[in-house]
Amino acid sequence: MRILALTITLVLSGALSCGDPVHSDAVDALGADVTAPGPTHRAGQPCLVCHGGLGPSSKEFSFAGTLYKAQTTKDALEGATVALTDAKKGKASAKSNNVGNFYIEATSFMPEFPARVQISFPDGATQVMVTHIGHDGSCASCHADPRSPHSPGHVWLVDDPAFFPGMPPQ
């Protein structure tokens, strides 16, 4: 009887501790979080690694990312609107916060891929993503720094920071 109880305990322990090792590695690769959890943490990182339904966060997003003012800077773009349209013309939008982060909770919008996206700023400046989003609503899954043959770099509003809305002419 003791052997049976021990066997059941070991099997259940193993089953409960098993998870998706690829997902666990992706979470571990993010490194330590240097800010408190919340809407301003982990700017520039692939949000859906933790918020994509597999955890460790219980808050699930369908889309999330970080916006920057210009292609060549890491200055956060606060107050921009991210507008998404999915394959069935479903729409959702979100505003970027003080570190440039935005997110759309999965409970309010679950897209049918592919999706299209554009960002706009209150002064009328707009950036439309030329390609579609095929399957992953985490911007940083494709838009990683630094820019390379495998990534266009982070998401930005203007190419040159000198032309950022509201900046005085140089």
Sequence positions of predicted segments:
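The canonical Cys-X-X-Cys-His
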Residues: 42-54, 136-147
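C-terminal motif of bacterial Sec signal peptides marking the signal peptidase cleavage site
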Residues: 14-17
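A short, solvent-exposed beta-strand micro-motif common in secreted/extracellular proteins
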Residues: 111-123
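Short, ordered, surface-exposed loop/turn motifs in non-cytosolic proteins
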Residues: 72-88
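Short, surface-exposed beta-strand/beta-hairpin micro-motifs centered on an aromatic residue
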Residues: 99-108
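Short, acidic Ser/Thr/Gly-rich low-complexity loop/linker segments typical of extracellular
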Residues: 88-99
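Bacterial signal peptide processing site
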Residues: 19-21
